Amino acid sequence: MDLSIRNLPTKFSLNTIRNVTEFYANRLMGNKLANHVSVRLVFAKGLRKTTGCFAWCTWEDDNHRPREFTIMMDARMGEKMLLTTLAHEMIHVKQYAKGELKDMLSAPSISRFRGKLYDFNNLDYMKLPWEKEAHNNEFQLYEELKEYLKK
């Protein structure tokens, strides 16, 4: 995986964040797909305060099975929150890269998830199926990371 990290808070090790991101990518997408994905991880102070979000993920190249992504993350999170949030956002990278999630360019508020269209202006955030999947699996992925790091 091609990974660039910007504005990493000094309380975190560059190697740790790199290894964690690569672990999540390989675990979610397998080595073959993960090796063809590029992620730009950007930390921003006050992101949650200005946007209401701890983090978000967006594709940068093409909405049909994209390979280039940016993940924006609030720089003021603690370690567990950051690693769990990164797991959540990497699940979205997997959803986009595998073609499970696709933003509809002709209708910006509509996304297709596993073949079904959803207007996210008319649904609560937690009822969006791609968010349900990310929320339901982020902690398990984080726990798998902790087990992996014990080895």
Name every feature range the model reports, one short phrase each:
Residues 80, 84, 96-130:
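Post-HEXXH active-site segment of zinc metalloproteases
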Residues 28-35, 100-102, 145-151:
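Surface-exposed helix-capping loop/turn segments at secondary-structure junctions
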Residues 17, 37-41, 69-71:
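Hydrophobic beta-strand residues in large extracellular and virion-surface proteins
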Residues 120-151:
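Long, well-structured alpha-helical subdomains associated
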Residues 46-80, 93-97, 101:
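Active-site scaffold of zinc-dependent metalloenzymes
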Residues 12-36:
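Zn2+-dependent metallopeptidase catalytic core
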Residues 88, 92:
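Histidine-centered divalent metal-coordination motifs
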